[in-house]
C-alpha cells in the first residue's frame, strides 16, 4: 500500500491518493470507490477486521504526517502561479497558463482532483467560432425587460460571461445566481441543459421541493460546475436562505453519516442556473442583488430537445475545446491586467469577468460597462416587481 498510495489531509479529513490511477479517495469504508480499491488491488474486504485495522492506521498517519492538499471536483485557480487547472478524466488535468493548454497528470501540481462523473471528451482546442452560436446566440431574448434597458445583445454577453465564469469556481467565491425567466416554451431549461452538456457531457436538471433542505448542499457539491434548478415557480422559504448563503460565499456544516461528532464543511463551487416563470422567491434584496437576469420570450418555432442536445454532444469536442481556448485568453488577461477595486457594481469578480469576456470578443470596455449598468437596473426592478405598494403609489 505504501508503494502505490500517498496519504493526504484534505480540509482536515483523511484521504489517499492512488499513484497508479492518479485519483483521490476519502478513507471511509462506506465510500464505495475506496472499498473497491482495497478489495480489487489488495484483497482487503470491508467486512474483514484486518481491513478496519489498516484503514485505522491510514487515518492515524494522515493526522500526524499527511501532507495538506487542495482537493477539487472540476476547476481550481492557483493564485500563486496564476494558472487555471481543470479536471480531465481519470488521472489527468489541464493547466492553462495564458499561452498554452497543458495536459498533465493529476496530483502533480498544487491541486488534486476528486473523481467526477462527467463524460470525457478529447477537445479540439482553438477559436472555432462555434461556442456562442451553439449555446447563446440563437435564444429568443425578451426585448421588453423589467428595466427596459437590458437589450438582447446585453443578455447574450451576460450569458456568455456566466458560461466562462463556470471555469473559475474558487476564483469567484461569491457566485452570481443565473435566473432564466420565461413563459412556457421559451426554451429556458433547454438553454441551460445545452451548457451543461457542452461542459460535462451530460444533463441533469434538479427539481427542488419543500423537503429537500438537508440534501441541497450535497446536491450542489456533486453538480459542479453547473447545477440546474428547473421550474422553480413556487416560493420555498428555506430556499431563500440557502440561496442567500450560496451567493455570499457561505457554506454548510454537516455531520458525517454514522458518526456523532465528525462533521464536514461543505462549500460548493457549482454555478447555479434557475429556470422560472415566477421569480418571487428571488425578489428578496440580498438575493436579487446577486442575480443575473436573462429574460426569454416565447419561441414561435420549436425544435426537438433531444435532437438539439444530441447535436451539442456531437459537437462537444469543438465546443469544449473553444471554451478552453477562451478560458486561456481570460487567464492571460488576469495575469497581465491590474484589477481595479473601485468598480461601482456588486459582485466585483464577476464584473471583471464580463470585461474580460468583452475584450476577448473584440468589444470595447464600454460595452461591458453598459451591460453591467443595465444588469444592475434589472436587479433593482426585480425587487420592485409586483409590489402592491408601488402599484398603489
Placement of each model-derived feature along the sequence:
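N-terminal nucleic-acid engagement/recognition segments and initiation subdomains in replication
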Residues: 1-126, 154, 219, 325, ...
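Catalytic micro-motifs at enzyme active sites that drive phosphoryl/nucleotidyl and oxygen chemistry
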Residues: 4, 70-76, 81-84, 163, ...
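A short acidic (Asp/Glu
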Residues: 96-97, 188-191, 237-240, 285
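P-loop NTPase catalytic core of nucleic-acid-dependent motor ATPases
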Residues: 100-223, 354
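Well-ordered alpha-helical segments embedded in enzymatic catalytic cores
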Residues: 158-162, 242, 322
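Feature primarily recognizes SF3-like P-loop helicase cores of small DNA viruses
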Residues: 173-176, 202-241, 255-274, 279-393
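AAA+ P-loop NTPase catalytic core and its hallmark functional loops
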Residues: 241, 245-253
Amino acid at each position: 500500500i505504501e508503494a502505490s498510495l500517498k496519504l493526504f489531509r484534505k480540509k482536515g479529513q483523511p484521504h489517499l491518493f492512488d499513484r497508479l490511477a492518479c485519483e483521490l479517495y476519502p478513507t471511509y469504508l462506506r465510500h464505495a470507490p475506496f472499498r473497491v480499491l482495497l478489495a480489487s488491488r489488495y484483497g482487503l474486504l470491508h467486512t474483514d477486521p484486518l481491513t478496519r485495522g489498516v484503514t485505522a492506521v491510514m487515518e492515524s498517519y494522515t493526522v500526524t504526517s499527511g501532507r495538506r492538499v487542495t482537493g477539487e471536483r472540476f476547476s481550481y485557480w492557483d493564485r500563486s502561479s496564476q494558472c487555471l487547472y481543470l479536471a480531465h478524466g481519470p488521472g489527468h488535468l489541464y493547466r492553462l497558463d495564458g499561452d498554452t493548454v497543458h495536459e498533465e497528470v493529476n496530483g502533480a501540481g498544487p491541486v488534486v482532483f476528486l473523481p467526477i462523473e462527467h463524460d470525457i471528451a478529447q477537445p479540439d482546442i482553438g477559436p472555432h467560432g462555434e461556442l456562442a452560436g451553439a449555446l447563446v446566440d440563437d435564444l429568443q431574448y425578451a426585448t421588453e425587460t423589467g428595466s427596459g434597458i437590458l437589450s438582447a445583445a446585453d443578455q447574450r454577453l451576460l450569458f456568455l460571461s456566466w458560461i466562462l465564469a463556470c471555469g473559475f469556481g474558487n476564483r469567484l467565491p461569491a457566485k452570481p445566481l443565473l435566473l432564466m425567466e420565461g413563459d412556457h416554451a421559451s426554451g429556458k431549461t433547454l438553454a441551460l441543459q445545452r451548457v451543461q452538456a457542452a461542459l460535462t457531457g451530460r444533463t441533469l436538471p434538479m427539481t427542488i421541493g419543500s423537503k429537500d433542505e438537508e440534501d441541497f448542499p450535497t446536491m450542489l457539491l456533486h453538480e459542479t460546475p453547473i447545477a440546474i434548478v428547473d421550474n422553480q415557480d413556487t416560493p420555498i422559504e428555506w430556499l431563500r436562505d440557502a440561496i442567500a448563503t450560496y451567493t455570499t460565499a457561505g457554506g454548510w456544516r454537516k455531520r458525517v453519516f454514522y458518526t456523532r461528532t465528525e462533521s464536514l464543511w461543505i462549500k460548493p463551487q457549482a454555478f447555479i442556473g434557475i429556470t422560472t416563470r415566477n421569480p418571487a422567491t428571488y425578489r428578496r434584496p440580498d438575493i436579487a442583488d446577486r442575480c443575473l437576469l436573462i429574460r426569454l420570450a416565447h419561441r414561435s418555432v420549436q425544435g426537438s430537445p433531444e435532437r438539439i442536445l444530441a447535436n451539442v454532444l456531437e459537437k462537444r469536442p469543438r465546443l469544449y475545446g473553444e471554451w478552453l481556448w477562451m478560458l486561456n485568453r481570460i487567464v492571460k488577461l488576469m495575469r497581465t491586467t491590474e484589477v481595479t477595486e473601485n468598480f461601482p457594481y456588486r459582485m466585483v469578480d464577476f464584473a471583471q469577468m464580463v470585461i474580460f469576456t468583452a475584450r476577448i470578443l473584440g468589444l470595447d470596455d464600454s460595452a461591458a460597462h453598459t451591460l453591467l449598468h443595465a444588469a444592475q437596473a434589472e436587479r433593482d426592478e426585480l425587487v420592485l416587481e409586483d409590489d402592491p405598494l408601488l402599484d398603489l403609489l
